[in-house]
Amino acid sequence: MPISYCVSAKKASVVVESVVGNFTGHENVNLIVARGNRIDVQLVSPEGLKNVCEIPIYGQVLTIALVKCKRDKRHSLIVVTEKWHMAILAYRDGKVVTRAAGCIADPTGRATDNLFSLTIHRNGLIAIRAFEGSVKMIQWESGTDLRHFNVRFDYPNVSDFKFVDTGEDDVYRVAFIYDDDHGKHLQFSDLNMHDKEFRTYSRQASIAADSSVLIPVPHAIGGVIVLGSNSVLYKPNDNLGEVVPYTCSLLENTTFTCHGIVDASGERFLLSDTDGRLLMLLLNVTESQSGYTVKEMRIDYLGETSIADSINYIDNGVVFVGSRLGDSQLIRLMTEPNGGSYSVILETYSNIGPIRDMVMVESDGQPQLVTCTGADKDGSLRVIRNGIGIDELASVDLAGVVGIFPIRLDSNADNYVIVSLSDETHVLQITGEELEDVKLLEINTDLPTIFASTLFGPNDSGIILQATEKQIRLMSSSGLSKFWEPTNGEIISKVSVNAANGQIVLAARDTVYLLTCIVDEMGALDIQLTAEKKFENEIACLDLSNEGDDPNNKATFLVLAFWSTFAMEVIQLPDLITVCHTDLPTKIIPRSIIATCIEEVHYLLVAFGDGALVYYVFDIKTGTHGEPKKSNVGTRPPSLHRVRNKNRQHLFVCSDRPVIIFSASKKLVFSNVNVKLVDTVCSLSSSAYRDCLVISDGNSMVFGTVDDIQKIHVRSIPMGESVLRIAYQKSTSTYGVCSNRTESKAERVFASKNALVTSQSRPKVASTRADMDESPPNTTSSFMVLDQNTFQVLHSHEFGPWETALSCISGQFTNDSSTYYVVGTGLIYPDETETKIGRIVVFEVDDVERSKLRRVHELVVRGSPLAIRILNGKLVAAINSSIRLFEWTTDKELRLECSSFNHVIALDLKVMNEEVAVADVMRSVSLLSYRMLEGNFEEVAKDWNSQWMVTCEFITAESILGGEAHLNLFTVEVDKTRPITDDGRYVLEPTGYWYLGELPKVMTRSTLVIQPEDSIIQYSQPIMFGTNQGTIGMIVQIDDKWKKFLIAIEKAIADSVKNCMHIEHSSYRTFVFQKRAEPPSGFVDGDLVESILDMDRSVAMDILSKVSDKGWDPSLPRDPVEILKVIEDLARMH
């Protein structure tokens, strides 16, 4: 049975929590950010934030906090995970060490429904309210396990719980908000450490009913601030001080999301709310003999940020805004307003979580993932591609460019660019960042340039070579020149040059000429014909190279391909003797050829007119090569170019699917480039544009830098509202998007309001809730049609009050050539637990005028269509507790054909062939089969375990991957070896259990990376998933023969790497559902396996040498170097 290999293609980007303190040194200021299962530590410097380290955490981080005991000069970091593991970390000698660790779970306790709170006393005592009826007090000493005890705490409906700073180490006073039958109250209680019980100190009864957040104010001011939706209250630490209330227009119906202290004295606090407003709360404090007294408060508006979940004042007016729903930001507070705002964004950190839905689309021949991300004003679509990015520095509008050649004339940096058009040549002088069209020496600008370069460089060269279809020109900055033309006047078609040594090879129809450029001691120029050879066929492309493809050494051989014989030859220099003749594996004309060497491996690469590329491993000693390997790099004739980046040579494939080819572990890697089209390219390193590329798409030239490595690239399309579902329609090149728009007091740009055309509709039924229709909500649900390339909203269709778009697909029905969008909606009233009325609406986009959206049909259903799919040209829908199948009639109407009712609530469904996988809110997954002849569903198999499902996906027609609400993944398979149950069903037998640590929201059968043909280890059935934390993960099936091999590697790494939480890897990945626990099985932790690639090689080799090979397939590698190559191949899949 295959094993599931699970790995993160893009790690979590949601900010769980962030803190600022002195972690890496008592004089260092650090920003520490928790994301998913890792913590990033950054150093605050005058140049900005610098990465110090990344701390992997065995668990989903629930919260982090800083603590500094009296004898400590720097802070320690408290980490609590979702499974109630806790650790206290410190940074010593450049490493993260664990000072104390332990499990704080209460085996008999029930987790609180509405509040998890961690608060720290000034002397280091930690209080955690996580379980009903008690507060856990944690004492610790460095190098020991955590010691904790419970204190009884029976107050109902607690909103917040915090230690109060009294200025005394032995006074343990807490403040908390709770509500009972008499209203909401604020209470101060002191903890008696001897009796381990709380004793009431004071109580402020009947505070504002909307009070929910406590902010402790540092001593010497002391006390707490209470935040509500319409008011703020300050309560002093003692019973004698006056309570200070405050309200203003800025507080009207405000829901605060987080707060952060500005001054150590506690006179200023930053506040953020659900509208993304950044507010400053100021305490007006007076000092007297009896201490400090708060006289009044004031709130000022500073500007708008992402909806913040964590806010930290760093220093000098710089603030970090961490967000779960939008991009995190680094902002600066200003003393003077700019456009009504006192803040300016310095840097934005992309966040693609929470992911609500996603769809895989092929655009320009490259797969890309489009996700529904974020919520409310920070809702957006994110376009995600895997490849190498080019960051644009400058661009020049210049159409028709066919060649670009850098020139370094009497300079240590490139100072000219020769640009060839289809009928002429331009010389552009580079002065700083400016380009000027100039005349240079005797360069022929009346004809297109085939090749141009400086010779005998690389620096301070005064000699330029230009090749046109008529002649070769050699020119000196001293004014001397020398021209060479074919004796028979034939047209020069192809040229290749070894510039450092003055070697030129050119093709004129069927003849190859080898030329040598010479400069004598007096500076005179000469071009000598070294050799020529006539072939039987016309030459299509050629290239000069040598051993190592070193541009500083003389070329020793030539490789060329022919037009009509579809053959390739390797020719020895200087006598032009053929040493290798090869028939190419296709009858398409070769258009470009290169002989290169990367990582000491020689390759011959040939690109063909249909966009195919074939490459061979070439043995330069014997003149032989291996079997051809093929890759598609576009749909038009590609051209191959050598480019340099960071002092390393790569190959750039210019096409309508541009690719950069580099090597990893002596294997070629084809990485997509994040531009749509490249006609030609060159490397450039001028004074202003160092180590960059110049590319042309036929309309403009772009100067840009290249990413160091292949990575995920994210493009953001702000929507200004929550985007819930997305579908792609290839026939109209559009996306269909379901969204929810919430009206706000602030000015907002809503995508659904900016459509070219709008329309609206309501269900054609009498409302079941006339009372609710009288007070419609401030939220409107829409279905939008967006252009695939520009993401312009072409049409927005608004649904009725209380009606929410829940699902959408694009598809075709049987006997109908049209492609439709189908949208499922539900009338969701806030006081109803289950939707009673919904509808399925069928839309058609006009092929010509795509802003026209026609409502073809609508069907009222009893419930919410939570998921819809196309099944053999029919529509299958999960509607509350039923699965319904509708056929499409010739009258363009949906007609119910059959139903399945054995569900609580069907949240998701997937289709493969005639099979339907159903994810139920409580009853795990079941497998239905549509019997076409009988016209009904048959429940083929069922998982009898209780799982609270979120989503599912087919692995094969008889195996299913499930994601459930307790952050777990599992796999099940139809077990046909066991007897069928009494009611005629098989059992879906569990084959894998795994704790993911994040909520898997959506799964789809797809991949961003095409599997390399030369991979040692092959995989199948790729499934991508998106989580609430913004992780994009990938699960693939790997053949059973690799199972013990991968498990052994996983165990060896887990045993060798000490995790800061001091728990076993198997404990971390244990599947936990309520009181049930299942050891991890059927999955391999790809993140852990591939972490060895980030280790020092000596450390990695030592770990891999300890891998146990017991029970392995004999054909599998055992040498650590070969095992590492397998892991590198696994990393190439994403």
UniProtKB/Swiss-Prot annotation:
Keywords: Cell cycle, Cytoplasm, DNA damage, DNA repair, DNA-binding, Nucleus, Ubl conjugation pathway. InterPro entries: Beta-prop_RSE1/DDB1/CPSF1_1st, Cleavage/polyA-sp_fac_asu_C, Quinoprotein_ADH-like_sf, RSE1/DDB1/CFT1/CPSF1, WD40/YVTN_repeat-like_dom_sf. Pathway: Protein modification; protein ubiquitination. One of its GO terms (molecular function) is DNA binding. Plays a role in DNA repair. May be a component of an E3 ubiquitin-protein ligase which promotes histone ubiquitination in response to UV irradiation. Histone ubiquitination may be important for subsequent DNA repair. Promotes the degradation of the replication licensing factor cdt-1 during S-phase, thereby preventing rereplication of DNA during a single round of cell division. It holds the Pfam family CPSF_A. It comes from Caenorhabditis elegans. GO terms for cellular component: cytoplasm; nucleus; site of double-strand break. This is DNA damage-binding protein 1.
